[in-house]
């Protein structure tokens, strides 16, 4: 697990890694009875694995490594160019590393107004200028503060658990802390691939049980038109 300079506004002061023994499994089937941070376990087959015998927890690699990024509003307000205050925080590549980080980070409802918190595939920077993001766009959902933490967690689990049929199209996700509502967006690579984008939008809504219509805005349109950019697709 790679650890960068860690903004104190993201990570709690006393971060203690938690030992997680089971992989992410069918998180969205657990319903509201599952505690935040709980990982679903499968039925045992009665066998004792070698990692249990040795006393060393088994590691469960993810298909991709992911990096958390943070844009600090206190620093951002003093910068002249967009993105100059954006910093990588941690990179993780296993289920155990993810939960250790997530359980010791501040969740969206506790972040300062104006903050932006990202989780992107490793080596992809959460910027329009990144060559992998340049031709893409984003789906966006809005949530009241009391629902933002769970929605952010379920979005992260869907990403790192490779739940999307067109997961290769996904760059990452961001939660924007704004006023009474939070925005969560999923960034994708190729905006012209309509079938893939619409599939991602529909599946995301299913995973989060989100009933409102959502829109997909192409990055190029957002750069040119800002808030006047129109949805290219809806789901």
Swiss-Prot record:
Single GO molecular function: translation initiation factor activity
Keyword Cytoplasm set for record: yes
Subunit structure: EIF4F is a multi-subunit complex, the composition of which varies with external and internal environmental conditions. It is composed of at least EIF4A, EIF4E and EIF4G. EIF4E is also known to interact with other partners. In higher plants two isoforms of EIF4F have been identified, named isoform EIF4F and isoform EIF(iso)4F. Isoform EIF4F has subunits p220 and p26, whereas isoform EIF(iso)4F has subunits p82 and p28. Interacts directly with EXA1.
The gene coding this protein: EIF4E1
Domain of life: Eukaryota
Phenotype when the gene is knocked out: Delayed bolting. Increased resistance to potyviruses such as clover yellow vein virus (ClYVV) and turnip mosaic virus (TuMV).
PTM notes: According to the redox status, the Cys-133-Cys-171 disulfide bridge may have a role in regulating protein function by affecting its ability to bind capped mRNA.
The keyword Magnesium appears for this protein: no
Protein's name according to its UniProt entry: Eukaryotic translation initiation factor 4E-1
Residues annotated as binding mRNA: 78-83, 110, 128-129, 178-183, 223-227
InterPro entries given in the database record: TIF_eIF4e-like, TIF_eIF_4E, TIF_eIF_4E_CS
Gene Ontology biological process terms, A to Z: defense response; regulation of translation; response to virus
Effect after changing residue 84 to A: Normal bolting time and partial resistance to potyviruses such as clover yellow vein virus (ClYVV)
Effect of residue 80 to D: Normal bolting time and increased resistance to potyviruses such as clover yellow vein virus (ClYVV), watermelon mosaic virus (WMV) and turnip mosaic virus (TuMV, including resistance-breaking strains TuMV-E116Q and TuMV-N163Y)
Residue ranges of the region described as Disordered: 1-59
Compositional bias annotation for Basic and acidic residues: 1-16
Single GO cellular component term: cytoplasm
Function according to Swiss-Prot or TrEMBL: Component of the protein complex eIF4F, which is involved in the recognition of the mRNA cap, ATP-dependent unwinding of 5'-terminal secondary structure and recruitment of mRNA to the ribosome. Recognizes and binds the 7-methylguanosine-containing mRNA cap during an early step in the initiation of protein synthesis and facilitates ribosome binding by inducing the unwinding of the mRNAs secondary structures. Key component of recessive resistance to potyviruses. (Microbial infection) Susceptibility host factor required for viral infection by recruiting viral RNAs to the host ribosomal complex via an interaction with viral genome-linked protein (VPg).
Tissue specificity field: Expressed in all tissues except in the cells of the specialization zone of the roots.
Compartments where found: Nucleus; Cytoplasm
Family matches, as Pfam families: IF4E (PF01652)
PROSITE patterns noted in UniProt: IF4E
Disulfide bond annotation, renumbered to this chain: 133-171
């Amino acid at each position: 697990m790679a650890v960068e300079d860690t903004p104190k506004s993201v990570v709690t002061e006393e971060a203690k890694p938690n030992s997680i023994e089971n992989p992410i499994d069918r998180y969205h089937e657990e319903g509201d009875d599952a505690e935040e941070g709980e990982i679903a376990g499968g039925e045992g087959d009665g066998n004792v694995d070698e990692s249990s015998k040795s006393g060393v927890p088994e590691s469960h690699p993810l298909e991709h490594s992911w990096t958390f990024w943070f844009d600090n509003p206190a620093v951002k307000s003093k910068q002249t160019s967009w993105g100059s205050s954006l910093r990588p925080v941690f990179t993780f590549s296993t289920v155990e590393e993810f939960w250790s980080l997530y359980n010791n980070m501040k969740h969206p409802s506790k972040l300062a107004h104006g903050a932006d918190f990202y989780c992107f595939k490793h080596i992809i920077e959460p910027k329009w200028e990144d060559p992998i993001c340049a031709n893409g766009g984003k789906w966006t959902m809005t949530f009241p503060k009391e629902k933002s933490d769970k929605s952010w967690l379920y979005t992260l689990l869907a990403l790192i658990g490779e739940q999307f049929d067109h997961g290769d199209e996904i760059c990452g996700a961001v939660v924007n802390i704004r006023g009474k509502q939070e925005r969560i967006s999923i960034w994708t690579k190729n905006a012209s691939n309509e079938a893939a984008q619409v599939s991602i939008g529909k599946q995301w809504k299913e995973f989060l049980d989100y009933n409102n219509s959502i829109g997909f805005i192409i990055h190029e349109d957002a750069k040119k038109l800002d808030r006047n950019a129109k949805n290219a697709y809806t789901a």
